[in-house]
Regions:
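Generic serine detector
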Residues: 6, 19, 77, 105, ...
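Generic hydrophobic secondary-structure signal
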Residues: 17-33, 69, 90-92, 100-102, ...
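A short, solvent-exposed beta-edge/loop patch
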Residues: 31, 35, 123-182
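Charge-rich, low-complexity N-terminal segments
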Residues: 1-72
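Short, solvent-exposed recognition patches
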Residues: 47-140
């Protein structure tokens, strides 16, 4: 009886190993036939043209968006929050894949700028970009260029070097806000 039990025990282990090999072979075949592109960029670009057109009719300030950036720049995020200070956001990766964002809001600059620039501080310096005087803010994580406007603030911020922030600020174009319907 012990010989029969021993033989059954060995068969059970052998059957388990064979089953595992069959399952692994099936998984390998399935993996081979699933399409994949190892060279594809994992960061998806977003098209912000529809959101921009919508926000330009809804926002109470001239909404800024870049025009003419090099093709290596990639828009990665877009949103508008009409509840939280009419906040407009466009996120980009520059040619070196560093983050640059355009932020606009009617929230007071003293509150808004440190929030979107991850606690950057005003240096007291300014820089003229495309004929406009931008405040220079610097921080541990992000630097920022800040353009105070009438009832709103525009911020170009991110982890990218200052040259990329300046390039974005120079590319920004605005259209006046839509007139309210009467």
């Amino acid at each position: 009886m012990d010989a029969v039990a021993s033989k059954r025990g060995k068969q059970t282990v052998r059957d388990m190993i064979l089953s595992t090999l069959v399952i692994a072979a099936c998984a390998g075949v399935i993996y081979l036939f699933i399409p994949k592109d190892e060279h594809a960029d994992p960061i998806k670009a977003v098209d912000f043209t529809v959101e921009l057109a919508t926000v330009r009719t809804a926002a109470p300030y001239p909404v800024a968006a870049p025009e003419g950036l090099p093709k290596e720049w990639k828009a990665t995020s877009v949103r508008y929050d009409d509840v939280a200070g009419d906040a407009w956001h466009l996120g980009f990766l520059d040619a070196d894949r560093r983050y640059v964002a355009v932020e606009q809001s009617t929230t007071a600059a003293g509150t808004y700028v440190p929030e979107v620039s991850r606690k950057a501080k005003d240096t007291g310096r300014t820089e003229t970009v495309a004929g406009r005087e931008w405040q220079v803010w610097e921080g541990a994580k992000y630097d920022a260029l800040v353009l105070p406007g009438e009832g709103h603030t525009t911020v170009v911020t991110g982890s990218a070097p200052k040259e990329s922030l300046v390039e974005m600020a120079a590319a920004l174009k605005t259209t006046p806000p839509a007139s309210p319907a009467s």
